Swiss-Prot record:
Record-linked InterPro entries: BRICHOS_dom (IPR007084), Gastrokine (IPR051772)
GO-annotated biological processes: gene expression; neutrophil activation involved in immune response; NLRP3 inflammasome complex assembly; regulation of cell population proliferation; response to bacterium; response to cortisol; response to wounding
Entry protein name: Gastrokine-2
Free-text tissue specificity from the UniProt record: Expressed in gastric mucosa.
Secretion signal, residue range per the UniProt entry: 1-20
Organism, scientific name: Homo sapiens
Residue ranges annotated for the BRICHOS domain, each copy included: 54-151
Subunit details: Interacts with TFF2. Heterodimer with TFF1; disulfide linked.
Length: 184
């Protein structure tokens, strides 16, 4: 009887802890013949999704903070953090991310003609004292003490050109690229 009670207690503890927290590992081939590993953590209680892309010098961490309405992406080989106000028409809700992950795992190559182009500019010197309450603590932990770049969605994409873009894994499926040398 003691074993049954202990088993039920352990099952209850682990069941409660994993209730609002999901972790997915995705390994996919990269363009240079290696592999890209992604770890996607969906926290339904905090209303966030954290995507870690492990790809050598192109490794990055991206936080989708649905509670505060911001996306922050940090390419780990660069000393910069890119912040974008979430556009709910182009960014799927948190509960749909699991479906996108399933599609990514089920389909090796998925092409979408819909892209969201974003232009990033350094935050002005007047905004050095960032209101972290507005952006939320997950983004503060990712981006504090490094230069910040504010993103804005580019509506007119006819004149857009990119010198170099980082678009990998789940971010690529969502149509999000981090680009340098954008001409608008």
């Amino acid at each position: 009887m003691k074993i049954l009670v202990a088993f039920l207690v352990v099952l209850t503890i682990f069941g409660i802890q994993s209730h609002g927290y999901e972790v997915f590992n995705i390994i996919s081939p990269s363009n240079n013949g290696g592999n890209v590993q992604e770890t996607v953590t969906i926290d339904n209680e905090k209303n966030t999704a954290i995507i870690n892309i492990h790809a050598g010098s192109c490794s990055s961490t991206t936080i989708f903070d649905y509670k505060h309405g911001y996306i922050a992406s940090r390419v780990l080989s660069r000393r910069a953090c890119f912040i974008l106000k979430m556009d709910h028409q182009n960014i799927p809700p948190l509960n749909n991310l699991q479906w996108y992950i399933y599609e990514k795992q089920a389909l090796d190559n998925m092409f979408s003609s819909k892209y969201t182009w974003v232009k990033y500019n350094p935050l002005e010197s007047l905004i050095k004292d960032v209101d972290w309450f507005l952006l939320g603590s997950p983004i503060e932990k990712l981006c504090k003490h490094i230069p910040l770049y504010k993103g804005e969605v580019v509506e007119n994409t006819h004149n857009v050109g990119a010198g170099g873009c980082a678009k990998a894994g789940l971010l690529g499926i969502l149509g999000i690229s981090i680009c340098a040398d954008i001409h608008v």
